[in-house]
Amino acid sequence: MKRLFTSESVTEGHPDKVADQISDAILDAMLEQDPKSRVAVETLVTTGIAIVSGEVTTRAYVDIQDIVRKTILDIGYTRAKYGFDGETCAVLSSIHSQSPDIALGVDKALEAKEGELIAEDELEQVGAGDQGMMFGYATNETKEYMPLPIMLSHKLAMKLSEVRKNGTLPFLRPDGKTQVTIEYDENDKPVRVDTVLISTQHEPDVTISEIKEALIKHVIDPIIPEELRDDKMKILVNPTGRFVLGGPSADTGLTGRKIIVDTYGGAVPHGGGAFSGKDPTKVDRSAHYFARYVAKNVVAAGLADKFMIQVAYAIGKAQPVSVMINTFGTAKTDEDKILKAILEIFDFRPGAIIKKLDLLRPIYKKTAAYGHFGRELEEFTWEKLDMVNELKKIL
């Protein structure tokens, strides 16, 4: 049976993404000075104000005001007439120390306390910073090993920001959203783009027809592949007819409210934990990255066309309480064999994940817009395919 599936993305100027980028910029600043920083920073942005709060244990000193303003200005909120700008907005900060009760379990895992875990170094004794379940996914329907709807949505959002910032379309403002609907055939292969939707903030003196014509030429045509188009493809641009007031002055933004945009566009479940503002001892972040790393290597090794893994943790314990896989009927070998190989090859302890992916670095602001997965950036170590040969041995 044919089916339609839709995913969305947002630009870096979307209020929730402004909040995510501020939280991750603060995290980066702390990790740069003190890689052992424990950070959980939340941000709220609304008309004329940014509020930063959270729990932090660090030896670093960072200028919160300066980081917040610079991040907002870099995104493009540079003029007071936007209702929110980095020069004039108020910045409030309320940050306090991490709970010592949580630190007890993170600093030294339950297994280490009970003598079950003999680790080479302090990092490998780290326990999970919280309970929860994390999902990783990969599919061979795109070269990035990501679902096509979310990848096209991200690429449209990135292009929308690019043509705004480089002056190609000077009437655009920072806020924007994209959405792509893909038709899949009976074999679950993407065959065509059914609908492209772009909503973008703009200057008041430009018409909707001018916006649509410009976006088709400079954003949609360069991104949507010719082989996925037909004369039935629908293009929707600013369906309300007007989008002048946008950004935090129109919608309050909060850290962690775009978790589906951040991951797989709704193609698979999500454990619920957000990423931004959290240091890698928080398995909400590090275990999600590691689960993606495992899934991508499994699919790239040819063990399955689609692969999902769920990992779950208990606070203060190093080893996961469960690991589950699903190949959606696409496995090229026995699923039990795949799971056994994964558990032998990959170490799911938080400290081991941090070491393997080199996560104690100031790399996180780059993750905070346009997806944490599917981008081949040097800092995104979880996108590496360095375990493919090891996994191929089980075929």
Swiss-Prot record:
GO molecular function: ATP binding; magnesium ion binding; methionine adenosyltransferase activity
Alphabetically ordered keywords of this record: ATP-binding, Cytoplasm, Magnesium, Metal-binding, Nucleotide-binding, One-carbon metabolism, Potassium, Transferase
Principal subcellular localisation of the protein: cytoplasm
Region spans: Flexible loop: 98-108
EC number: 2.5.1.6
Catalytic activity entry: L-methionine + ATP + H2O = S-adenosyl-L-methionine + phosphate + diphosphate
Binding site for Mg(2+): D16
GO cellular component: cytoplasm
Cofactor list: Mg(2+); K(+)
InterPro entries (UniProt xref): ADOMET_SYNTHASE_CS, S-AdoMet_synt_C, S-AdoMet_synt_central, S-AdoMet_synt_N, S-AdoMet_synthetase, S-AdoMet_synthetase_sfam
Cofactor note text: Binds 2 divalent ions per subunit.
Residues binding K(+), per UniProt: E42
Binding site for L-methionine: E55, Q98, D251, K282
Single Gene Ontology BP annotation: S-adenosylmethionine biosynthetic process
Pathway membership, UniProt: Amino-acid biosynthesis; S-adenosyl-L-methionine biosynthesis; S-adenosyl-L-methionine from L-methionine: step 1/1
PROSITE patterns: ADOMET_SYNTHASE_1, ADOMET_SYNTHASE_2
Compartment(s): Cytoplasm
Xref: PANTHER family: S-ADENOSYLMETHIONINE SYNTHETASE
Protein family per UniProt: Belongs to the AdoMet synthase family.
Function per UniProt: Catalyzes the formation of S-adenosylmethionine (AdoMet) from methionine and ATP. The overall synthetic reaction is composed of two sequential steps, AdoMet formation and the subsequent tripolyphosphate hydrolysis which occurs prior to release of AdoMet from the enzyme.
UniProt name for this protein: S-adenosylmethionine synthase
Organism expressing this protein natively: Thermosipho africanus (strain TCF52B)
Organism placement in taxonomy: Bacteria, Thermotogati, Thermotogota, Thermotogae, Thermotogales
Gene name tied to this protein: metK
